[in-house]
Amino acid sequence: MSQPKPILYYDERSPPVRSCLMLIKLLDIDVELRFVNLFKGEQFQKDFLALNPQHSVPTLVHGDLVLTDSHAILIHLAEKFDEGGSLWPQEHAERMKVLNLLLFECSFLFRRDSDFMSATVRQGFANVDVAHHERKLTEAYIIMERYLENSDFMAGPQLTLADLSIVTTLSTVNLMFPLSQFPRLRRWFTAMQQLDAYEANCSGLEKLRQTMESVGSFQFPSSSAVVTEKVE
């Protein structure tokens, strides 16, 4: 019996959405996409609230299953469409390393990114304590630099869900606070950009930049261009 097609409610300006889109592209999953415009408040429409009371994207519907967190969605899709693969390792300790970094992304990195972005949208860039947020996000850079001391990827020698989750948020933070002072992180980011699946991050990232410029009057630093150079 064939599986029902997953339905992903999304706004690609959201970093967690983009991590799901990267996995979908990487595994070539046939998914129905339904756009929810966060900046127009479509997540508060009655039909969507009935589906997801958290009024957030991504939201995945797969048969009778409804998932409202990107990390749960990543795990679910990997278990369904990458069975036996290395994105969500089979060995317990390795899987827990990946889970630990998924939780780092949602509770530490993305939270700090979201705090800054939300303040900029609500208050306008001129009224935000940018230095405070830069310190908080630089701390996240320092932590990730340490994660990469002994491995090429965040959770070990191979690409995992942790990398897909982290790279979309990091690429957003890099627009605002370039990571040029962190060589291991730059090397990892460059490697991630060379994946075919990274293309699924690019459109939403640019749309977010444009939205922040227009809504929050955010002044992006001139050095915030996406890292493209080879790092030896």
From Swiss-Prot:
Boundaries of every GST N-terminal domain copy? 4-85
Classify the source by domain of life: Eukaryota
Pfam families per UniProt:
GST_C, GST_N
SUPFAM superfamilies in UniProt: GST C-terminal domain-like, Thioredoxin-like
Task: State the Gene Ontology terms under molecular function.
Answer: glutathione transferase activity; steroid Delta-isomerase activity
One GO biological process term is: glutathione metabolic process
**Cellular component GO terms, alphabetical:** cytoplasm
The main enzyme category here is transferase
Q: Which reaction does it catalyse?
A: RX + glutathione = an S-substituted glutathione + a halide anion + H(+)
- Where expressed (tissue)? Expressed in the adult ovary (at protein level).
Mitochondrion as a keyword? no
Q: Which InterPro entries match?
A: Glutathione-S-Trfase_C-like, Glutathione-S-Trfase_C_sf, Glutathione_S-Trfase_N, GST_C, Thioredoxin-like_sf
Q: What else is known?
A: Member of the Halloween gene group.
The family note in this entry says:
Belongs to the GST superfamily. Epsilon family.
The name this protein goes by in its record: Glutathione S-transferase E14
